[in-house]
Regions:
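Mature-chain termini and adjacent capping regions
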Residues: 1-205
């Protein structure tokens, strides 16, 4: 059976199957107990194929939310589903972490979020350590968030600027969310890690 929704706004609730991202910066995996809440302008759901397409979509669970112009979901309602969001994708968890992208592939395994692959020209992420206005910010052609490892990996002309004033570029960055550690990797045999620091005090006594 195929369902097409052309109302001004569709509101769907899928209980207890998958949990939306507990944060691009969360250290703990999300819980599967809370329902996913889907709002969209247009919804087309194929019960036979177990797929769905959405336009002007917002997907929320708890305090986490993904918004995009369109989305396609496979294995909708199962413990292992895959979502493809396209067009002005914004992934937010709380006041501390966000990802902006042109496209994001979101994978759930065993009822919880497993991985997000965000791409863009560029895709961007932001991580706040405290309630201050400053934040670590990064951009790359590809940003991968792995939930169990609590890591964000940046590839494709990545750049990072930290709340402490460091600006870096390298072939790849690995950002460890649990302890806030940042690792930069260069290609083998090259010196491609570039760091700029901006001292806040005077260098002259």
């Amino acid at each position: 059976m195929t369902f097409n929704g052309d109302l001004l706004w569709r509101h769907l609730v899928i209980p207890g199957v998958v949990a939306l991202m507990a944060g691009t910066v969360a250290a703990e995996p999300p819980t599967p107990r809370k329902p996913i809440v889907i709002d969209s302008a247009v919804a087309s759901i194929d019960d036979t194929a177990n797929t769905a397409d959405f336009t002007t979509i917002s997907v929320a669970q708890g305090g986490a939310r993904i918004t995009a112009e369109t989305a396609h979901a496979t294995d909708l309602g199962s413990k292992n589903s895959r979502w493809t969001f396209t067009g002005r994708v914004v992934i937010t968890a709380d006041e501390r972490g966000s990802i902006w992208a042109d496209k994001a592939i979101v994978v759930y395994r065993d009822g919880v979020l497993d991985e997000i692959l965000a791409t863009g020209a560029p895709a961007r992420f932001e991580r706040r350590h405290t309630d201050s206005a400053r934040a670590d910010q990064g951009q790359a052609e590809e940003i991968t968030y792995e939930v169990k490892q609590a890591t964000v990996r940046l590839r494709g002309h990545p750049r990072i600027s930290t709340e402490n004033g460091l600006e870096m570029n390298a072939p790849m960055f690995l950002y460890r969310l649990r302890d806030g550690r940042l690792q930069a990797y260069s290609d083998q045999g090259t010196q491609a890690v570039h760091i700029i620091t901006k001292p806040t005090g005077s260098l002259v006594p």
